[in-house]
A protein has these predicted regions:
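Intrinsic low-complexity, intrinsically disordered or marginally ordered coil/linker segments
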Residues: 1-271, 275-283, 293-301, 309, ...
Length: 349
């Protein structure tokens, strides 16, 4: 299955001209508010043949035949439109290894290349529509049959930029703004504006955080529903369920531990990151500090800030060293743990 790309189209211009555009491009199945790419850049029915290994094999064989037929040279393409069937049959009698169905597919693909520049629908659609399928993803919620200035649909793998450029050539007085976003949230997203067949404005999110927020807006997602949370620096989103950390008790409160050297870029907003220093012999943790250079013993994540006072660190005794409880939690589970405990207490009450 492909990655789905959501497309939002906003139209600006004379309402009657917009209505005319929507009538021209509508899908016969879905009506006003939908788009049929064939109404904008039509695809020949002869291209609608099987795309895959059988066609590839047949095309290779048919090209071998053309080399033999033209003596590996060139010939006027008009003459190649009327190749005698007898010539093909002579070649096939010599090549008994060829499957007849693959031969016919290859022959059709070769003719499509000659006439349309692509062997099958697949390559033609990628080249002429910018995506491999027609628009899809319609529902009663996304098609507005009354208001006439917004379109919503999905495409496979990529946005249909050639289609929209052609559409604004067909209707030069209408300005079209196109926003798109891949379901791989934060990737393959942006905004183009078109008028009179020309792209007049481009926008791409500048940061990872901006890209995630842009995509979530188009898909109508809450980042938290995708287990994504903005990091403490506000520069990127962190997946809360990808990695597990060791559970510890630190200064009498639950915390998480990892051997890695974390920064605020690695933890979600609402949590705090500190560092453990181990003794010179590496036998025990001797302190927790905001930053540790030498003898770094690991990073800890807490739900509350630690007050280090004037000293700038907190030393451990044998009784106050971090206690490893033996469990593991993701960042998401750690964030939710207090809420779960409160819920359990309420149930007991």
């Amino acid at each position: 299955m492909p990655n789905h790309v959501v497309n939002h189209i906003s139209l600006q211009g004379d309402p009657e001209k917009i209505r005319s555009m929507l009538e021209t491009i509508k899908s016969d199945e879905h009506g006003i508010g939908s788009v049929d790419f064939n109404k904008i850049v039509p695809m020949s029915k002869s291209l609608d043949i099987e795309a895959g290994s059988r066609t590839d094999r047949g095309l290779k064989v048919y090209r071998d035949f053309i080399d033999v037929y033209t003596l590996a040279g060139t010939m006027n393409m008009e003459k190649l439109r009327n190749i005698p069937v007898e010539s093909e049959e002579i070649f096939l009698r010599q090549r008994t290894d060829i499957r007849r169905d693959e031969w016919e597919l290859g022959k059709a693909a070769w003719r499509n290349i000659r006439d349309f520049g692509a062997p099958t629908w697949y390559d033609w659609c990628i080249s002429n529509w910018g995506t491999k399928w027609n628009a899809y993803g319609y529902s009663e919620d996304t098609i507005d049959y009354h208001d006439g200035d917004t379109l919503y649909f999905q495409t496979a793998w990529s946005a249909p930029h050639p289609i929209l450029e052609k559409l604004t050539q067909m209707f030069p007085d209408i300005m079209l703004e196109h926003e798109w976003a891949d379901e791989d949230v934060g990737q393959n997203c942006g905004r183009y504006s078109y008028q009179n067949g020309e792209r007049i404005e481009e926008y791409y999110p500048e940061s990872e955080a901006e890209a995630v927020e842009f995509a979530c807006k188009l898909w109508d997602y809450d980042p938290l529903d995708l287990d994504l949370c903005l990091n403490a620096e506000g520069t990127k989103y962190i997946h809360l369920e990808l990695e597990e950390y060791q559970q510890i008790e630190l200064l009498g409160k639950p915390a998480l531990f990892t051997n890695a050297r974390l920064t605020d870029a690695d933890i979600p907003q609402g949590l705090y990151c500190y560092h453990l220093r181990h003794s010179d012999d590496g036998g025990r943790f001797c302190s927790v500090e905001p930053r540790v250079g030498v003898n770094h013993g690991g990073s800890v994540i807490t739900k509350e800030p630690i007050d280090f006072g004037k000293q700038g660190y907190i030393s451990f005794t044998k009784d106050t060293e971090p206690n490893f409880t033996g469990g593991e939690q993701t960042l998401g589970e750690f964030l939710k743990s207090d809420a779960l405990q409160e819920s359990e207490v309420m149930n007991l009450c």
